[in-house]
């Protein structure tokens, strides 16, 4: 207002001067003010006096910017025009500020000077008024907001060089008055360039500030520092507020969901409260039903239907910010209808529709509603499921029960009874098998071998129990006292010089095990006679008789049975009182009371003295010791209790029943052959050995010298000194019989090799044949295995039932014996057992010490 008064006063002053002086010069504006960027035009009136002499002058009007003193534009007046109006267009005024209009005359004739004068006018230009507005963006872009720029002033249509404006947005998290008491505020600035328009929306992205956000908008002209307009800081929460989004009316089934829509660039954090709208009574307070807190960033919450009353009622929701208790969102109300229709609890399952196989069971629930005529509970009131009981084929009742069958109970009873029955069956079977093994199984007896020997009518060669029942547990001797001279193979040192035992092929194992029990029962009659002979021997001992005994080693070849020694034994010990008391039940012996001593036999030698300390002696024909004997050696632990006799010179004797007639017999040929018998024996030996040599390496020499014996003793690890060589082993005698030490070493190696095999397979009735197949590795030079091409049973079938006479089977010798038919049947043990071609597991029926 003051500038206008000043201009008006200046104008009056000019008019007065002109009137007084009679000559008026002035420059006058029609409008004292102007709006920049507007489409208004500025008009300037002028008047000047050219002088008394009428000299023409050039006059111009300049538009100057007062702040910078720069000329915006210049306009020239006509020479013959002393007064008039000049028009200045809108595009000259792009920026607000102070402008000057100046009129300056110029002389046309330089020769005539004139005084300088200048007229001017002042113009004030202002910015147009722009209104700034903020708005939410579309839902698809919740992280943005819009800035609106609007003006009511018409803008100048710039023909060229149209100016641009810049919109700056500043985000802060606090108000300026709150910054003094808090830490440094967060401030984020963003700008956008836009064209000059009377109204427009400019979209901006949000800056992450938090639950509180303030925005300041600044509008500038591009390239200029002047600010057209500035708005802010604007509280976005107060500007936009929080909105609760919900349907106006709903039927509550499980819950009511309320969504909070926060202001732009603001995160939700507060409490949603629900209350029932109270009647409009004075003094009536609003009842708050529940409050749900929303953590930072969470927008949705659900209220359970149990909070609302049955029927249709109006409920209102409100959102408040805990940090700004003075501010709350606009209250939103809605109608909520809650029906009474709801489901009750499920009833128990019904019984299965079938007693076996697949059935169906059902359960129901009831709809609880205030309108029983038309229940509208959502869901199913009936539920069915399959129930599977036991299969019909597995359990069928004998008669249908009138009562309702209890499927699960009966099924459990069947399982229980079945389990108990199975357990009882297993227990009974275990007890029966144990009793059968302990009492019902016969003794596992080996198949005895044939013996081609004949003895005196009063004595007959017997076998110890270990030869008959090797696989069974150790029992006492057949004698009453049980003190017979027994011993493990490692405890006896009898030089069995001439003995041959053919190995048995491996195919005899199966047949031998099958006929084992039947063969073991057939040995009972001979064993009865052996026991009777023991009783008669004790009667002779009671009378103080002495006897001449012969110790033989019996093998499958009777010719190679070896006489150990012949010595008059000491008078036998008298019986114990218990035995004397039982004499009346025994059969008297028919033997004479004088001792029978053979004149041709040598006295006891050192052989008998070191019997207990000599190593195990075995026939040369026996390549390996039997597995049962090896087992007895290990179980007895060195010299066994049964192996050592009470009297070192005790020998077992036997006799037949008193009713038996004495049959013709011949003296058995000793191992020391006469010159008359040597050629025939040697020929048979060579014939048999030729048949065996086909199955073993030709590495053994024809003669076994005494120095070889020492080597074998060292290789076999003997337990004691070996017996001296018999007389038949001389350097000049061409006999093919091996030495005792030869197979004594093989015995030790055989035990070491057969024991792991037996531990792996267990005891078998046919283990003898397996052990005989293995050779005794003494040295690489003398390692061989004796294999017979034909078994003894095949020889019996092909040649003769008792003794074959073919030279190839020389181990069955008939030339030196004359046996009756009864004696041959008695001695033909394999034939007596009824062995066939498949049962070839015929082994010797004697231990290494047999006394006749």
Swiss-Prot record:
<dbReference type="Pfam" id="PF24306">
    <property type="entry name" value="THSD1_N"/>
</dbReference>
<keyword id="KW-1133">Transmembrane helix</keyword>
<dbReference type="InterPro" id="IPR036383">
    <property type="entry name" value="TSP1_rpt_sf"/>
</dbReference>
<protein>
    <recommendedName>
        <fullName>Thrombospondin type-1 domain-containing protein 1</fullName>
    </recommendedName>
</protein>
<feature type="compositionally biased region" description="Polar residues">
    <location>
        <begin position="766"/>
        <end position="778"/>
    </location>
</feature>
<keyword id="KW-0225">Disease variant</keyword>
<keyword id="KW-0597">Phosphoprotein</keyword>
<keyword id="KW-0967">Endosome</keyword>
<feature type="transmembrane region" description="Helical">
    <location>
        <begin position="414"/>
        <end position="434"/>
    </location>
</feature>
<comment type="subunit">
    <text>Part of a complex composed of THSD1, PTK2/FAK1, TLN1 and VCL. Interacts with TLN1.</text>
</comment>
<feature type="disulfide bond">
    <location>
        <begin position="356"/>
        <end position="392"/>
    </location>
</feature>
<feature type="topological domain" description="Cytoplasmic">
    <location>
        <begin position="435"/>
        <end position="852"/>
    </location>
</feature>
<dbReference type="Pfam" id="PF24311">
    <property type="entry name" value="THSD1_D3"/>
</dbReference>
<keyword id="KW-0965">Cell junction</keyword>
<keyword id="KW-0812">Transmembrane</keyword>
<feature type="compositionally biased region" description="Basic and acidic residues">
    <location>
        <begin position="655"/>
        <end position="669"/>
    </location>
</feature>
<keyword id="KW-1015">Disulfide bond</keyword>
<dbReference type="GO" id="GO:0050840">
    <property type="term" value="F:extracellular matrix binding"/>
</dbReference>
<keyword id="KW-0964">Secreted</keyword>
<dbReference type="GO" id="GO:0005829">
    <property type="term" value="C:cytosol"/>
</dbReference>
<feature type="glycosylation site" description="N-linked (GlcNAc...) asparagine">
    <location>
        <position position="304"/>
    </location>
</feature>
<feature type="compositionally biased region" description="Polar residues">
    <location>
        <begin position="670"/>
        <end position="685"/>
    </location>
</feature>
<dbReference type="InterPro" id="IPR056217">
    <property type="entry name" value="THSD1_N"/>
</dbReference>
<feature type="region of interest" description="Disordered">
    <location>
        <begin position="624"/>
        <end position="799"/>
    </location>
</feature>
<feature type="glycosylation site" description="N-linked (GlcNAc...) asparagine">
    <location>
        <position position="58"/>
    </location>
</feature>
<feature type="glycosylation site" description="N-linked (GlcNAc...) asparagine">
    <location>
        <position position="39"/>
    </location>
</feature>
<dbReference type="GO" id="GO:0010008">
    <property type="term" value="C:endosome membrane"/>
</dbReference>
<feature type="glycosylation site" description="N-linked (GlcNAc...) asparagine">
    <location>
        <position position="69"/>
    </location>
</feature>
<dbReference type="InterPro" id="IPR056218">
    <property type="entry name" value="THSD1_D2"/>
</dbReference>
<feature type="glycosylation site" description="N-linked (GlcNAc...) asparagine">
    <location>
        <position position="135"/>
    </location>
</feature>
<feature type="modified residue" description="Phosphoserine">
    <location>
        <position position="463"/>
    </location>
</feature>
<keyword id="KW-0472">Membrane</keyword>
<feature type="compositionally biased region" description="Polar residues">
    <location>
        <begin position="785"/>
        <end position="794"/>
    </location>
</feature>
<dbReference type="GO" id="GO:0005768">
    <property type="term" value="C:endosome"/>
</dbReference>
<feature type="disulfide bond">
    <location>
        <begin position="352"/>
        <end position="387"/>
    </location>
</feature>
<feature type="signal peptide">
    <location>
        <begin position="1"/>
        <end position="24"/>
    </location>
</feature>
<feature type="topological domain" description="Extracellular">
    <location>
        <begin position="25"/>
        <end position="413"/>
    </location>
</feature>
<dbReference type="Pfam" id="PF24310">
    <property type="entry name" value="THSD1_D2"/>
</dbReference>
<feature type="compositionally biased region" description="Basic residues">
    <location>
        <begin position="645"/>
        <end position="654"/>
    </location>
</feature>
<feature type="disulfide bond">
    <location>
        <begin position="367"/>
        <end position="377"/>
    </location>
</feature>
<dbReference type="GO" id="GO:0005576">
    <property type="term" value="C:extracellular region"/>
</dbReference>
<feature type="glycosylation site" description="N-linked (GlcNAc...) asparagine">
    <location>
        <position position="80"/>
    </location>
</feature>
